[in-house]
């Protein structure tokens, strides 16, 4: 692969080019970055929206299969898909354009391949609905939760910044990384107090905002997610920022992070063993 110079994390602005317009379908090779990561961007201003409601089991009649490709329009043309961000099994994460409000959003498709029982899809949506009550920098604001003809859809605000992999590639300082994950830990604490887990189960779930907060960018709580899983996920996010590697088992679409090196017992080596400059207290 071609090596490119690493920029400072504070200079990192990873979104689609400024020539993306409402009504224009991206080319076959979609822009890699949306144009939202700039100070004063109106997409960060509060907008009026109906609070997410409990999704009904007897939703509308099944639609044709949704083709999740860049440029595709869904929900009657309301959202245009821009960039796929992967995801664990049964979920797909997309960056999209809300064509009605001309702002970027994060879309989480729940069971788009229809492999889960309907009751399990309902449980995911019900748990995710509980996250809509949280207002923390460490979680994207949930704007809508709904059934579709092929599963479910969670619409969230778009976290401007970079993916965990992109920011880890800039070699942020250990202290900066430790501070950044505090926002995710605070969001998890609030979610656990409300009786729900965040489901931090995949590197692509997490983004680092331009404000420097590590956040759950694609909310959708799986039925088997636990607070203990979240604690491991928070630790894994910090590990990735420190070492550019992922210490947990990764399933689903690859995030680009390499797996962590392991010790003779099969456990991930401590970050300090990878980089001796990492303070012992953080490692």
Name what the model sees in each region.
Residues 180-181:
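Activation segment signature within eukaryotic-like protein kinase domains
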């Amino acid at each position: 692969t071609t090596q490119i110079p690493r920029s400072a994390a504070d200079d990192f602005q990873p979104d689609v080019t400024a020539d993306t317009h409402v009504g224009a379908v991206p080319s076959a090779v979609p822009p890699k970055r949306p144009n939202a990561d700039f100070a004063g961007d109106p997409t960060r201003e509060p907008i009026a929206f109906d609070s997410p409601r409990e999704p009904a089991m007897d939703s509308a009649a099944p639609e044709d299969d949704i083709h999740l490709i860049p440029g595709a329009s869904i929900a009657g043309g309301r959202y245009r898909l821009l960039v796929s961000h992967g995801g664990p099994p049964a979920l797909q994460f997309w960056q999209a354009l809300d064509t009605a409000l001309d702002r970027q959003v994060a879309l989480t498709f729940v069971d788009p391949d229809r492999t889960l029982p309907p009751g399990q899809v309902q449980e995911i949506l019900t748990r995710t609905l509980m996250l809509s009550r949280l207002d923390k920098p460490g979680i994207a604001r949930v704007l809508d939760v709904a059934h579709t003809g092929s599963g479910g859809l969670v619409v969230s605000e778009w976290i401007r910044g970079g993916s965990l992999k992109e920011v880890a590639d800039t070699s942020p300082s250990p202290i900066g990384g430790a501070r950044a994950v505090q926002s995710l830990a605070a969001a998890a604490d609030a979610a656990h107090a409300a009786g729900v887990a965040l489901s931090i189960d995949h590197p692509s779930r997490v983004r680092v905002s331009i404000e420097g907060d590590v956040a759950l960018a694609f909310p959708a709580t799986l039925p088997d997610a636990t607070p203990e899983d979240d604690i491991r996920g928070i630790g894994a996010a910090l590990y990735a920022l420190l070492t550019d590697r992922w210490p947990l088992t990764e399933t689903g679409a690859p995030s680009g992070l390499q797996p962590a090196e392991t010790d003779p017992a099969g456990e991930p080596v401590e970050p300090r063993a990878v980089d001796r400059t990492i303070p012992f207290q953080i490692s």
